[in-house]
Amino acid sequence: SVAVAGAVIEGATLTFNVLQ
């Protein structure tokens, strides 16, 4: 669903920010 896609995108963005 759209909500799940949004959560996945936010999780990936957060992980990306932490790893940088």
Curated annotation (Swiss-Prot):
GO terms for biological process: killing of cells of another organism; monoatomic ion transport. It is found in: Secreted; Nematocyst; Target cell membrane. Pore-forming protein that forms cations-selective hydrophilic pores of around 1 nm and causes cardiac stimulation and cytolysis. Pore formation is a multi-step process that involves specific recognition of membrane sphingomyelin (but neither cholesterol nor phosphatidylcholine) using aromatic rich region and adjacent phosphocholine (POC) binding site, firm binding to the membrane (mainly driven by hydrophobic interactions) accompanied by the transfer of the N-terminal region to the lipid-water interface and finally pore formation after oligomerization of monomers. Keywords: Cytolysis, Ion transport, Membrane, Nematocyst, Secreted, Target cell membrane, Target membrane, Toxin, Transmembrane, Transport. This is Equinatoxin-1''. Belongs to the actinoporin family. Sea anemone subfamily. The keyword Ion transport applies. Octamer or nonamer in membranes. Monomer in the soluble state. Residues 3-12 are annotated as: Plays an important role in the hemolytic activity. GO terms for cellular component: extracellular region; membrane; nematocyst; other organism cell membrane. Residues 11-20 are annotated as: N-terminal region. It comes from Actinia equina (Beadlet anemone). One of its GO terms (molecular function) is toxin activity.
